A protein has these predicted regions:
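Active-site-proximal binding-pocket segments
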Residues: 160-306
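Glycine/tryptophan-enriched, flexible segments
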Residues: 16, 72-226
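Glycine-rich loops and low-complexity Gly/Arg-rich segments
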Residues: 26, 52-54, 78-81, 102-105, ...
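Soluble or luminal CAZymes and related metallo-dependent hydrolases
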Residues: 36, 131, 249, 253
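An acidic- and aromatic-residue-enriched active-site/binding cleft used to recognize and process polar
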Residues: 32-34, 58-59, 83, 155, ...
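Trp/Phe/Arg-rich N-terminal binding region typifying the photolyase-homology
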Residues: 1-93, 195, 259, 305
């Protein structure tokens, strides 16, 4: 089923309309933690007075609120968050729930053709499988053969040492719980600092960003996490910004990274750090310009991580 609306706010009314047209009694959905999306979902539930609405935390392993300080506040530093997260996880690893059987519906066309009105990109989609079966196979292959060596290989962009699962995670093709279960099945010592633990850290970083965004909604509003950085006097230099975007700064690793981004829609994690740092600390260009450009190009674009 596909419905198109003119703007984000209209999505509430269209959900109400679809529910009415199909005599819906229960609505199940997955939580999104961005501030606008959370407000939308609250409004949907208020609008659907006669529909039972149930939300689920599918994009995290432990939901926001599960890992807090002794004062019941959100952690602001990763390492103590990670330690508390691991302690909480050892109490019981959340299970992956099997998908329910599909029930037929005469009013919903399973072969619906959808035309999306935005420019197509010329990226090589072979690197980013959209089928769940292919993503699961890629996950299994990495956990068997790559996760144990990730600590040694992750710092070298020329080496195929990362999982390349970020696009599947960003679009929901894979869940982080699937990643965790496969990792522990192949590398059971990962939870206790053994082989695979460094890649597990990456999953925890992903959790950290989402928990932060939930408890500090200003992060969704182009505000900095560290307050004093809002007083930095950024340079307005369209020439430098364009050179950075096009990979023409004259700094080889920065330029190679940005050209990789522009041609493939993806960039190695270390290169994301290098190019972002160069833009902000060397060119003194507002980080929001970089954030905007990354999100316009990344096939795995993710607001929390970005």
């Amino acid at each position: 089923m596909f419905r198109e609306v003119d703007d984000f706010a209209a999505s509430v009314e269209i959900v109400k309309q679809v529910c009415a047209e199909n005599s819906v009694t229960h609505l199940f959905y997955n939580y999104q933690y961005e501030v606008n999306e959370r407000a939308r979902d609250v409004q949907v539930e208020r609008t659907l007075r006669n529909v039972v609405c149930e939300g689920f935390d599918d994009s995290v392993i432990l939901p926001p609120g599960a890992v807090m300080t002794g004062n019941h506040e959100m952690y602001k530093v990763f390492t103590p968050f990670k330690n508390a997260w691991l302690k909480r996880l050892r109490e019981g690893v959340p299970e992956c729930v099997a998908a329910p059987k599909v029930r037929s519906s005469g009013s919903i066309d399973p072969a619906l053709s959808i035309t999306l009105n935005y420019p197509r990109q010329s990226f090589d989609t072979a690197h980013f499988p959209v089928e769940e079966k292919a993503a699961i196979a890629q996950l299994r292959q990495f956990c068997q053969n790559g996760a144990g060596e990730y600590e040694q290989q992750r710092d070298f962009p020329a080496v195929e040492g990362t999982s390349r699962l970020s696009a599947s995670l960003a679009t929901g093709g894979l869940s982080p719980r699937q990643c965790l279960h496969r990792l522990l099945a192949e590398q059971p010592q990962a939870l206790d600092g053994g082989a695979g633990s460094v890649w597990l850290n990456e999953l925890i970083w992903r959790e950290f960003y989402r928990h932060l965004m939930t408890y500090y909604p200003s992060l969704c509003k182009h505000r900095p996490f560290i307050a004093w950085t809002d007083r930095v006097q950024w340079q307005s230099n369209p020439t430098y910004l364009k050179a950075w975007q096009e990979g023409k700064t004259g700094y080889p690793i920065v330029d190679a990274a940005m050209r990789q981004l522009n041609s493939t829609g993806w960039m190695h994690n270390r290169l994301r750090m290098i190019t972002a740092s160069f833009l902000v600390k060397d060119l003194l260009i507002d980080w929001r310009e970089g954030e905007r450009y990354f999100m316009s190009q990344l096939i795995d674009g993710d607001l929390a991580a970005n």
